[in-house]
UniProtKB/Swiss-Prot annotation:
Its main location: nucleus. Residues 1-52, 219-255 are annotated as: Disordered. Residues 53-121 bind DNA. Residues 1-10 have a biased composition (Basic and acidic residues). One of its GO terms (molecular function) is DNA-binding transcription activator activity, RNA polymerase II-specific. It comes from the Eukaryota. It comes from Danio rerio (Zebrafish). Pfam families: HMG_box, SOXp. Transcriptional activator. The gene is sox19a. This is Transcription factor Sox-19a. GO terms for biological process: brain development; negative regulation of transcription by RNA polymerase II; neuron differentiation; positive regulation of transcription by RNA polymerase II. InterPro entries: HMG_box_dom (IPR009071), HMG_box_dom_sf (IPR036910), SOX_fam (IPR022097), SRY-related_HMG-box_TF-like (IPR050140). Keywords: Activator, Developmental protein, Differentiation, DNA-binding, Neurogenesis, Nucleus, Phosphoprotein, Transcription, Transcription regulation.
Amino acid sequence: MYSMLEHDMKSAVPPTHQSAQGMTQLNGGVTHGSAKPAVNSQQQQSSDPMDKVKRPMNAFMVWSRGQRRKMAQENPKMHNSEISKRLGAEWKLLTDAEKRPFIDEAKRLRALHMKEYPDYKYKPRRKTKPVLKKDNPAAKYPLSAGNLLAAAAAQGSGGSPRMDSYGWGHTGGYPGMQTDALGYSQQLHRYDLSALQYPSAMATAQTYMNGANSYNPMSYSSTPQQPSPVMSMVKPEQVSHSPTGAHSHQRGPLQGDLRDMISMYIPGGDTTDSGAQRGYSNIQQHYLTGTAPLTHI
């Protein structure tokens, strides 16, 4: 019984070994077959042999070949670029008679090169230059006009109050608007100077603009009406500048205007000065006692 089992086991082992050998042969064939296209692709990628051919040397290269070696031995720490600069300077100092043998040697080498490689064509290689970072003008000139305008635009449409006070106008305005603002500020200064020259006319204008203060010593509110600075500056332009009778000449039209104002508030009343004073006294009593005046009914 044991002999039969051993016979069965021995008979079962060789087929597995043969199958393993067959698999290795198949794998080997596959790998061998795949290696051939790789070799062919490398052969196809091989560049033209003419690309490896060097250009023939010119006269300077023929002369500098020996001089470069000599200078490198004398100065072992010198860089190759520095050696080339010095050799170029020395080559320019040579006379035509000294350059003649090297020029003839360069012609001979060129003729030999054309004979060996008749189909040779020089194909210069383009060197990739590193992209240089452009200098930012804003970094160089932080206080330029363009940067100031950009900073003002970033603050919004309102602009900077400091810039507006100097007559620049709103942010982003056109040059015409800016010139108008500058001209307006100059006009204000001109009116201001004229007001300083005529203080009596200035006082009369303030009295006309705030007529209630001339009749009523008390102010009706904590914030009384005050003439705007622009109107107080512009008003002296309209007043006659006669130095002799300026104040007496203006009282007539001013009183007429006050009568018109009184007639607006007190309809049907007398338009004389006494009626105006009674109307203002009644108004004062109204504000003091809180009762409505009945004289105008």
